[in-house]
Amino acid sequence: MLQKISQRLLEIVDALPLRKGIRILEIGCGSGVAAREIVNRLQGVYVLGIDRLLKGIEQAKKSSKTEIANGKLNFIQAKVEEFNLPEKEQLFDIAFAIRVGALDGRHPEIEKRALEIISKALKKTGRLFIDGGDPLKEINLINISS
């Protein structure tokens, strides 16, 4: 069963700098609600969703069969701090993370590793957005290095 997007998540998607042809990495995608909303808004958009929980990834895949078959979406089970960009994947224009513990400031070493990995998955002009702003805030990745 498809989940309806919440008002909060809708506001977050609205705040993203979306454009035709953009490639997006969603960290902590859960059941894929935001990813589906994004790919159904614009043509040529691609979202790779990752989540540490297999249950969320299974639900996302089950609810997104058409979008996956059309090459608009993919989902991978992975912790962001251990994520390796698959060889077939190109770099991303933006990444966003909502309620992701590795990026909430409570675990500095995990957060440092996660930011290094995200930085490697983004194009040089890539941008990272996390919750905590109005509704998002951008994280500067310029000085992030491994």
Regions found by a protein language model. Name each.
Residues 3-22:
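Conserved alpha-helix/loop element of class I SAM-dependent methyltransferases that forms part
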Residues 31-43:
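Conserved SAM-binding loop of SAM-dependent methyltransferases across substrates and taxa
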Residues 53:
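Conserved SAM/SAH-binding beta-strand->alpha-helix loop
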Residues 60-61:
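Conserved SAM-binding loop
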Residues 69-82:
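Conserved SAM-binding strand-loop segment of SAM-dependent methyltransferases
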Residues 85-95:
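A short acidic, Gly/Pro-enriched loop at the edge of an enzyme's catalytic core
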Residues 111-124:
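A short glycine-rich, Lys/Arg-flanked "PGG" loop and its adjoining helix->strand segment in the class I
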Residues 125-132:
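Conserved beta-strand signature within the Rossmann-like core of class I S-adenosyl-L-methionine
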